Design a protein with these regions (language model features):
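A cyclin-like helical interaction fold
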Residues: 242-249
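Cysteine-nucleophile protease catalytic domains, especially the papain-like/related folds used
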Residues: 236-242
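Multi-pass membrane glycosyltransferase architecture that uses lipid-linked
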Residues: 2-235, 253-396
Length: 396
């Protein structure tokens, strides 16, 4: 009994230590500059408080839950903390600290879910991952805010002791879409798996209805601005996957955004026999790998999947992304490293290629199985090498 108590106290102290380190690193790193997104959120919040349209006059590309979250955080006041030297020296001062703490708490909740459903190790692979720390503490992007609700919806659906779990899970998935539409195709993936027609209808209608309603009241009077900001204005076509594997004719005659959307739907069909939780992890990887455009903050999206399926390829993905974050202009932007490597935007876009390639290989391994993947890969290598050898043979 004494040994068990000592063991429990040790594990509890270790847990508290890791949680403290995770929060501390996220707050500590926010002192090293800020991202353009934070400046845009400040500007959009000012418009919102003035009663002006964030879609017509601002550069706001999400549904309304995030602007309401920013507004609530702005109203919170802690004078004792606001006047400290550390806070006053941080870009954005206490308002930014509140955002960092809020997003850190979101990360902590995901960590708890991973800890309870898997292990402390898997939870820490997410919570102490440098990608997560930098995106939350420095960049202040809120992708995990949306992913948290999506993850909760999956876990609750798998709990067969909960009544009306299909409805509750669909509501949570709808909230996820409203916060940020990362999982925009996932209701379709889910619907493909359901056997009953009524369940298919629920998992499609409920989430998408919540997503659409989350634009109220702007959707009524400012539909054009909502449509342009959310779906049109910010689109680019520089996705690394399509640059590596897309023939030139694709880039000439097809929209990469359309191809990305079609591919995500097709993958939902292909993974119809996979468990819902597995499909959720695969989706988080696929939405980044096959994206028609790429920003550094996208690289945080598959972190839950990385933690669950952790192997040397995901370690390499983490290392490459962390090194990119040190020099990229949207992230830590360390000048002495940028000067050494003469880093610029073009270098960042080139760096995306090996990162996405590593993630793609890991994705194929997990989705089709390592044995099948390596058997197929060996056949391809053997075929190509035979063709090369036959093409260079000559008679003496």
């Amino acid at each position: 009994m004494v040994y068990k108590n000592q063991r429990f106290n040790y594990e509890l102290n270790l847990f508290i230590l890791f949680v403290f380190v995770g929060f501390f690193l996220r707050v500590w790193i926010c002192q090293f500059g800020s991202n353009m997104d934070f400046a845009l959120w400040q500007a959009n919040l000012d418009l919102f408080k003035e009663g002006r349209s964030i879609y017509e006059f601002g550069n706001y590309t999400y549904a309304t839950p995030w602007i309401y979250t920013l507004y609530i955080l702005d109203t919170l006041s802690f004078p004792a903390l606001e006047n400290t030297k550390f806070v006053q020296n941080i870009p954005g001062e206490f308002y930014r600290i509140k955002i960092v703490i809020f997003l850190s708490f979101i990360d902590f909740l995901i960590f708890l879910l991973l800890f309870r459903n898997y292990s402390l190790k898997i939870g820490l692979l997410f919570f102490l991952n440098p990608i997560s720390i930098i995106i939350t503490g420095h960049h202040n992007q809120f992708s995990q805010y949306a992913i948290l609700f999506g993850f909760l919806s999956i876990l609750l659906y798998e709990n067969k002791n909960i009544n009306k779990r299909i409805l509750i899970s669909s509501l949570l998935l709808g909230i996820s879409l409203a916060v940020k539409h990362i999982l925009i195709f996932f209701p379709l993936w889910w619907a493909f798996k359901e056997k009953k027609i009524i369940n298919k209808i629920i998992v499609i209608v409920v989430p998408y209805s919540i997503f659409i309603l989350s634009f109220f009241p702007f959707l009524i009077n400012e539909f054009q601005y909502v449509y342009e900001n959310v779906l049109i204005n910010w689109k680019r076509e520089d996705g690394p996957f399509w640059g590596m594997f897309g023939p030139k004719i694709i880039h000439m005659y097809f929209s990469l955004q359309t191809l990305f959307s079609l591919l995500l739907v097709i993958l939902g069909f292909l993974f119809v026999d996979k468990k819902l939780k597995e499909s959720f992890y695969f989706y988080l990887m696929a939405v980044v790998i096959f994206s028609s455009m790429m920003y550094t903050q996208y690289l945080v999206i598959p972190l839950i999947a990385l933690a669950v399926y952790w192997n040397w390829k995901f370690l390499l993905y983490t290392l490459l992304t962390f090194l990119l974050f040190l020099v990229d202009g949207d992230q830590l932007n360390l000048e002495f490293l940028r000067d050494i490597f003469e880093w610029d935007l073009r270098a960042t876009r080139i760096a995306f290629y090996p990162i996405i390639l590593v993630l793609f290989i890991a994705f194929l391994e997990e989705t089709i199985g390592k044995k099948k993947f390596y058997t197929f890969t060996n056949k391809i290598i053997k075929f190509v090498s035979q063709k090369i050898r036959s093409s260079i043979k000559f008679k003496i």
